[in-house]
Amino acid sequence: MTLKTKTNKNINIMNSKYALPKDGGLIADVALQELTQRFERIATQVYENEYDGVNYVADNIVAAIGAHKADRPFALGLTTGKTPLGLYRELVRRYNKGEVSFANVAVYSLDEFYPITPAEAQSRNYRIHEELLDHVDIRPENINFPDGTLPREQLSKFCAAYGHNKIDLMIVGVGEDGQVGFNEIGTHANSKTRLVQLSYQSRKVQSGAFGGLENTPKMAITMGIHTIMKADRVIMMAWGEDKAKIMSRVIEGEVTSQVPASYLQNHSDIEVVIDEGAASQLTRVQTPWLVGPCQWTPKFTRKAVVWLCGVVKKPILKLTYQDYLENSLGELLEQGRTYDQINIDVFNDLQHTITGWPGGKPNADDSTRPVKSTPFPKNVIVFSPHPDDDVISMGGTFIRLVQQGHNVHVAYETSGNVAVHDDVVLQHMDAAHELGFADEFAKVEEIVKSKKAGEPEPRALLNLKGAIRRAEARSAVRSFGLNPDTNAHFLNLPFYESGGIRKNPFTQADIDIVVKLLRDVKPHQIYAAGDLSDPHGTHRTCIEIVLEAIEVVKGDEWFKDCHLWLYRGAWMEWDLGSVDMAVPLSPNEIIVKRHAIYRHLSQKDIVPFPGDDPREFWQRSEDRTQTTAKQYNDLGMAEYQAIEVFVRMF
């Protein structure tokens, strides 16, 4: 997509620019499709990104509605949550273009919280109306939702009737534990529409929208597995790397009540539609040499050899001919190199990713180094989605770049204001009260008391929270020698400032802010968060904005010497098969990095949106980098205390 306008029109993030360059892998061949999918128990379509997958599902829905000739409305089952949002927007777009009508369609929502009213913004009823139904020509009498307002004594009768009519096409998503709707772990295959108790994990996932776990419903009404199985046809969707682990179990694992979505393997007409992130742990993606012929590039060869080392528990240079043959890598031995030459080549390839000079070592032979020695010093921009991602995810490298004399700038893309507890604000204002600003403390206390669960926070409170996070970020970079007054940039990208968990789509205004910074600094190196999995969604939006900005500046003279390095956040790390640069950290550098993370006091201990990992961010960061160092050591490299790794996008 090329930008041709300066308007603030929303950018379609599904049509993503963010995809790592393809480098080797399974050879696509229609004739071999049955072979390459032989581990999969459900017909599965893998698309490069959500945009392509959504279009495929939308094509199927539009075609099914158009082909429906019965005298009753076409019955369409709708899933809820984040997964279908892109699909609903695409269906609205097609309706507006005159490609589909919903006048003869009846919809059935998969689930609803209980108790809840349709007017509450967190209800499934409200969200599906907001995203789809309010924008198309569906008849009100054809809209069906579980009724979250019914008295308990009326629910059994309601549930006995709900969703048991003929459903022509059922669209479902999959929860991170394999839930379909609110069919939790342990659900029986014969379950029907019913009231269910929500698990702690499900309530925790939903708690952000409700303003905390204490405000999140403990129950829900959901179609059961048996109800879903009665649909004529089912399409299951999943997007993003955070769904990869569960989708591998749903698609390739045994049918089990521990993964309720796996029951759908037994449906006679089901299809799974996922993007490459959600497919990343399928056998044909993770270990494609087990299923078919491959293109053996140097980096793909490294991926296979690193995997083999893990299987046989040996370092690279100890792998034998038999190790390759007995673990389905015979094809690699047929590419013109002996096994020991492959070992040496991969060892050298991986070793050459290691450097203590992330900005390039001046006056040194750089023929095998990941970064050129010239120019020196380099102009560098570190993009940080939230005000602490820079030090959490690449703090050691950041410190090295500063201490080695480069002109380093850090750009905090969002304010991070919603991730500050109210108590933290009151604590800061209490200090102000001690200094004589009693009126201000009282005002803030009133603002906090006026908040309503699930509604956007008051702007005055968000401004205070943003100020707290800016002060913490300045303190962190000051701790290792960066001047925050000249080299720390708080972009406050507008898309983030919704006041709630759900952010606005990014627009040209966001892109223009990043473009200006790029042209001001003219960086030789750009570091950006390349997370494919992010419980907030902010990281993904931020990398898309950076890439859109790069599209604008790529014709500038300075850009020809620029390279983009991707780091990962506090959730996952790059696979060693894809790493382009590895920066080792000494024990002292880990302490300096940890102390920088400590400066983000509002994010210590308990934070509003911690994800599933109970550890503090500094602990996650250290465990992640120390695990990477151990992986390098296990492969036969030098033993380091910790290593931060990066992938070069260009």
Predicted regions and their residues:
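Class I SAM-dependent methyltransferase SAM-binding "motif I" and its flanking Rossmann-like core
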Residues: D177, G181-I225
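ATP/nucleoside-binding phosphotransfer catalytic cores, i.e., glycine-rich phosphate-binding loops
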Residues: L3-G24, T36, H226, D232-G330
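A conserved mid-domain beta-alpha-beta active-site/ligand-binding segment of alpha/beta enzyme cores
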Residues: W571-T628
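Glycine-rich N-terminal segment of FAD-binding domains in flavoprotein oxidoreductases
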Residues: A67-E99
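Short, surface-exposed, charged loop/turn segments at secondary-structure junctions
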Residues: E176, G181-L198, I251-E254, R540-A549, ...
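N-terminal glycine-/serine-/threonine-rich phosphate-binding loop
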Residues: T2-A75, D365-S367, T374
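Active-site beta-strand->loop->alpha-helix modules in alpha/beta enzyme cores, enriched
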Residues: A161, K313-P387, V391-K560, H595-R599, ...
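Ligand-binding beta-strand-loop-alpha-helix segment within the catalytic cores
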Residues: G24-R41, V100-I171
